[in-house]
């Protein structure tokens, strides 16, 4: 893509209000009685809501002082421990025959360090080791059904040390975090980027959570461990399914842990444990997460720009007070037959099929994918309604995932649970009648979790060389894709287009659902958070058959951070059966940095990536 043209368009976009589009639109008609307030009422509103955020300067100042004290304490503890552990290490080393390599000797040291006594020397006073397990090559680790968020444990792991730490965060709360530490040290002094089950690559990767779920995401951590990262993940301070929110009732400290504190503390302590295990600091620190995990990554880089060198976030649920109240509102009118916006669940598939019929060819290719949902409009039955933004609407093409939010007798817990337990502290709050604007204002006033990622000027992260990649599926039926447009545009307004272009890339993914998957046979896999789990617990480390920075977003981020290779395109992949690699590749297509889009060359195979190019519309 021509860079001046891209910057020129960004400059034009920076003068627009919110996420409104200046593109030509067409009228979209939908079967059935869909009136004002429907799930994808696409009217553009132009107001600036009051922002809510958490000032962290004072906290970070105290944290740095605490780090200094903790580090001195850790060194004293380490000196005592090394008297004992050094003798054990020496015993192991002298037993090594002359034919063994120096790497084998280093491996022996790592196996000794997979010991709670050794690792405890690197913990602050409010943290304790809960479990340390040495996992053999091809083994498994996790907590099974005791983990209410993700009970499936990863299998086929590389040799590693699995660690669980419990941290007291307040007199009434605590959180846990886990680590996977690949047991074989790198034989190179430089971090390398090969995907294998071999040595540690010298990098640290933190992974995020989902919904309101509480539990350590071992299954998602395995994606990083198979790429040879040392990996961190937190349980956010509780144990629950992603749709269970009752744990938050009258528990402000637990809500704070979920909002930001558990992940932030896990990164800080996990960094020290990595140093304790390997005898050296990680050379680079990365983050990968989607949905709530996307929000967590944005929140942490805003709070502590030093935490990560590179951040990969998908479908971020960053605007908590607006997104979650939006989920309550849409659930209110879609789930009640007596309301004008009611949509019977059996109509979801009918609507989705007709959207494809009307909108598929807008990009010049009839392939079953709605690639330009922003070009469509669904006129409101009440155009005179008060144009106050609650949250951005779901897009045409997202109908395949509506049942996850709306096929029920009451609003989803993402909305109703949030309002009852985070906002009002009333488990009997009546969802059938409420004032929309007042609910949002109450959420902004009463939700003190600090979860929202609403600090748009992230210059401190950019100034230290940080890189950010954000992606979002156009067919996301849970977190509307245009919410990411909104975040991008507000950051653009706060920082300016030239600075943004140097460190921030946003990729929209036509046809992809929430974080992964598709009902349109659309290319969806870019090696991002959680995507390998579509293939089972013995998942892959990257995009199967395409383990390189052109196809894998995490590897692309590594190349950008460490080698300065700009990410101006990613190639997404899907298979003939979307989650079965053995059925063969069905399609590959380039993803383009927003606001560019992929355009077919008019001649080549539409299923081949090389037949498409990135272009910015006039």
Positions of PLM-derived features:
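Intrinsically disordered, low-complexity terminal tails of fungal membrane proteins
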Residues: 1-68
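Cap/lid segment of the alpha/beta-hydrolase catalytic domain
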Residues: 197-201, 210-279, 325, 430-437, ...
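Loop/turn elements at helix/coil->beta-strand transitions in domains of secreted/extracellular proteins
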Residues: 200-204, 227-231, 280-285, 306-310, ...
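Gly/Ala-rich beta-loop-alpha elbow adjacent to hydrolase catalytic centers
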Residues: 289-293, 297
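C-terminal subdomain of alpha/beta-hydrolase-fold enzymes, centered on the catalytic histidine
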Residues: 390-591
């Amino acid at each position: 893509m021509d860079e001046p043209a891209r910057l020129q368009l960004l400059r034009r976009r920076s003068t627009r209000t919110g996420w409104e589009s200046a593109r030509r639109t067409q009228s979209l008609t939908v079967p059935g009685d869909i009136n004002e307030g429907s799930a994808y009422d696409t009217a553009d509103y132009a107001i600036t809501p009051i922002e809510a955020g958490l000032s962290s300067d004072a906290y970070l100042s105290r944290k740095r002082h605490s780090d200094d004290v903790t580090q001195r304490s850790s060194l004293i503890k380490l000196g005592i421990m090394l008297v004992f552990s050094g003798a054990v290490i020496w015993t192991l080393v002298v037993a090594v025959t002359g034919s063994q390599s120096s790497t084998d000797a280093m491996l022996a040291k790592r196996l000794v360090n997979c010991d709670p006594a050794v690792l405890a020397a690197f913990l602050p006073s409010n943290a304790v080791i809960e479990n340390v397990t040495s996992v053999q090559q091809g083994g498994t680790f996790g907590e099974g059904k005791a983990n209410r968020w993700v009970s499936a444990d990863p299998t086929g792991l590389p040799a590693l040390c699995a660690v669980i730490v419990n941290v007291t965060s307040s007199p009434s709360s605590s959180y846990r975090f886990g680590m996977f530490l690949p047991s074989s040290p790198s034989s190179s002094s430089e971090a390398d980027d090969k995907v294998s089950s071999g040595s540690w690559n010298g990098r640290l990767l933190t992974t995020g959570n989902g919904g309101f779920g509480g539990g350590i995401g071992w299954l998602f951590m395995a994606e990083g461990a198979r790429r040879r990262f040392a990996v961190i993940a937190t349980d956010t301070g509780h144990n629950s399914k992603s749709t269970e929110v009752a744990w938050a009732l009258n528990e402000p400290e637990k809500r704070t842990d979920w909002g930001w504190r558990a992940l932030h503390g896990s990164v800080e302590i996990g960094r020290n444990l990595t140093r304790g295990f390997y005898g050296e600091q990680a050379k680079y620190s990365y983050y990968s997460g989607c949905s709530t995990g996307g929000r967590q990554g944005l929140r942490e880089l805003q709070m502590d720009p030093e935490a990560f060198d590179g951040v990969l976030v998908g479908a971020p649920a960053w605007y908590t007070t607006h997104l979650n109240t939006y989920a309550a509102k849409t659930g209110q009118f879609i789930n009640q037959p007596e309301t004008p916006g009611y949509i019977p669940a059996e109509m979801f598939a009918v609507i989705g099929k007709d959207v494809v019929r009307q909108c598929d060819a807008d990009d010049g290719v009839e392939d079953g994918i709605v690639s330009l949902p922003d070009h469509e409009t669904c006129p409101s039955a009440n155009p005179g309604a008060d144009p106050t933004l609650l949250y951005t609407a779901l897009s045409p093409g997202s109908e395949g995932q509506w049942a996850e939010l709306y096929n029920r007798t009451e609003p989803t817990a993402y909305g109703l649970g949030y309002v009852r337990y985070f906002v009002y502290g009333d488990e009997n709050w009546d969802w059938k009648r409420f004032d929309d604007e007042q609910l949002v204002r109450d959420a902004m006033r009463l939700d003190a979790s600090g979860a929202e990622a609403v600090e748009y000027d992230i210059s401190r992260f950019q100034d230290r060389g940080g890189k950010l990649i954000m992606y979002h599926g156009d067919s996301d039926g849970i977190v509307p894709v245009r919410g990411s447009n909104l975040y991008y545009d507000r950051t653009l307004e706060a920082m300016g287009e030239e600075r943004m272009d140097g460190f921030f890339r946003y990729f929209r993914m036509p046809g992809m659902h929430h974080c992964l998957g598709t009902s349109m046979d659309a290319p969806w896999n870019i090696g991002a958070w959680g995507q390998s789990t579509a293939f089972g617990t013995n998942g892959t480390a990257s995009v199967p058959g395409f383990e390189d920075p052109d196809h894998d977003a995490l590897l692309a981020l590594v190349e950008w951070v460490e080698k300065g290779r700009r990410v101006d395109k990613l190639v997404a992949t899907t298979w003939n059966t979307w989650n079965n690699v053995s059925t063969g590749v069905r399609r590959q297509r380039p993803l383009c940095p927003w606001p560019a889009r992929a355009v077919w060359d008019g001649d080549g195979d539409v299923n081949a990536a090389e037949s498409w190019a990135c272009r910015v519309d006039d």
